[in-house]
Amino acid sequence: MNHKVAEIEGVGAAQAEKLEKAGIKTVNDLFKMCCEHEGRRTVSETTGIPEVELRRWSHMADLMRVTGIGPEYSELLAAAGVLTVKELGRRIPAHLTETMKEVNTLKNLTKSVPSEKEVTKWVEKAKTMGPNVWESANPIEQKKA
């Protein structure tokens, strides 16, 4: 399953419409078009959306490549300091789980925080993934938070 670009936290209806006019309808599309600086610049010129926003959204899209990470958990991970799959693969699951709990207590981003077991699965999966290759066979689903 692939999420619509409007599901990314921070992408409002107006931005989603601009992105769709530029051919970006899904999280997959956003990641493919904006994972590199050149692509972000082109999309920014086409849509008028600042590159810094496109970069933030592409980071969230990157994290959503990992099974179990959807829009809410990608936002929580970003708030906890994890911006990319590469960074996720370097984390210690127990520490990351605690950081996510602390961040969520302060910011109330999700209804629940994933278990250490779930975070361990994410970290292990992230270690096997390339930085900029979308795994089309990898479902992008998030368990209900």
Question: What residue ranges belong to the model's regions?
Answer:
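C-terminal extensions
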Residues: M1-A145
